[in-house]
Structures are given as structure tokens and as C-alpha cells.
A protein has these predicted regions:
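Short linear motifs in intrinsically disordered/low-complexity regions
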Residues: 15, 120, 138, 176-177
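Alpha-helical interface subdomain recognition
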Residues: 1-60, 66-76
Length: 187
């Protein structure tokens, strides 16, 4: 499959090229909708298609290989993907919401996560804060997060954490987390 390069137009990524690539992946993504619904997670081929479309790079700085598209452009792509697979469109939102949160991170953290692989996937959750207890030179983080979209495909988990009497945000490597397979969206 030949994909359009996301060429720059006056310093901006060609959003029409991204939308063309969504259309090219339409058959592959739609072929796996049933599997994804049955398994409660996106099919690996769908995740691969989203990466090849460029989803993880939407809000990433251009210096790290990102596209720096606008929220409106992201919404256009998300809408096009939702026409194929609503669950895949949800992941577009989740993966990019975590990147938007990254705008507040220091450069060291951003470099650590994205320098080697701008397609690194982050899962995010805004509920069920973990509990952090300060130790000698670190924090011990514990808890259960009852809802974390994209966690099976992500390398990092972004979540709220309670530090004594204040809320903060924690970024955890997924290989330090255990996924409990108890999600049933219908109840």
C-alpha cells in the first residue's frame, strides 16, 4: 500500500494527505471491527494502521517528528476514523489527549519518551487516582485504575495520583503495571 507522505505546506502538515491515508486503511480497519468488539481491545492491525496514518504524532512537536496539527484538524481525522470504527476513533482521542497533557511536561520527560520513537503510545485515565507514598528518594505508587483506554497498546500510563493532600499526575511505564481483564462496556 502506498501512503501519502505528510508533506509540509507552508510549514504545516498536509491534513488532506492524512485523510487520504485514513481512506486507504478503511478496508483493513473495518475488517477488524468485529474482532475488536469481541475482544474488548483494538486489533493489532488496527493499532498498526493508526500508527501508519500518523495518529501518535498529531500533537507531538515537529522537532520530535510530530505533526503539530490543530485540534480542528485532529477532529476531522477522528471523524473520518469514526465513520469506519468508533472504537478506533476513541483511541485517537485517548492517545492524543495524553500528548496534549505532555505540553506541561519538562523537556527531559518529553525527550525521554518520544526522542527514540515519536509513535510511542500513551494511555490516559482521569479517574481513580493512585496513591503515592514518599520514600527516601522516590515515591511508591499503588492503586487500581478502573478505566484506562488504550492500556493494552500503550508503553506508558498517564494517571492522576494523590500525594498526601494534593493531586498530581504520574507517568508510569506500562511494564510496571498489571492489567486486570475485567472490562465489559455493556455491563
Amino acid at each position: 500500500m502506498k501512503l501519502k507522505r505528510h508533506g509540509q505546506k507552508g510549514g504545516k502538515v498536509d491534513i488532506e494527505g492524512i485523510l487520504d491515508n485514513v481512506e486507504k486503511f478503511k478496508p483493513l480497519i473495518s475488517d477488524h471491527v468485529g474482532w475488536s468488539e469481541e475482544k474488548g481491545q483494538l486489533h493489532p492491525s488496527t493499532i498498526d494502521a493508526l500508527i501508519r496514518i500518523g495518529v501518535p504524532r498529531f500533537f507531538l512537536p515537529s522537532g520530535l517528528g510530530g505533526y503539530e496539527i490543530t485540534p480542528i484538524e485532529c477532529a476531522r481525522v477522528t471523524e473520518a476514523i469514526a465513520d469506519i470504527d468508533a472504537s478506533a476513533a476513541w483511541f485517537v482521542m485517548v492517545f492524543n489527549a495524553a500528548r496534549l497533557a505532555g505540553a506541561a511536561w519538562n523537556d527531559e520527560v518529553i525527550e525521554m519518551i518520544f526522542r527514540e520513537n515519536p509513535d510511542t503510545l500513551l494511555s490516559a485515565s482521569g479517574n481513580s487516582p493512585y496513591q503515592a507514598v514518599e520514600k527516601e528518594d522516590c515515591y511508591q505508587i499503588d492503586g487500581v485504575n478502573h478505566f484506562a483506554s488504550g492500556c493494552r497498546h500503550a508503553e506508558w500510563m498517564l494517571s492522576p495520583v494523590r500525594l498526601e493532600n494534593e493531586l498530581a499526575t504520574v507517568l508510569l511505564p506500562m511494564n510496571d503495571c498489571e492489567i486486570l481483564d475485567d472490562w465489559d462496556s455493556l455491563g
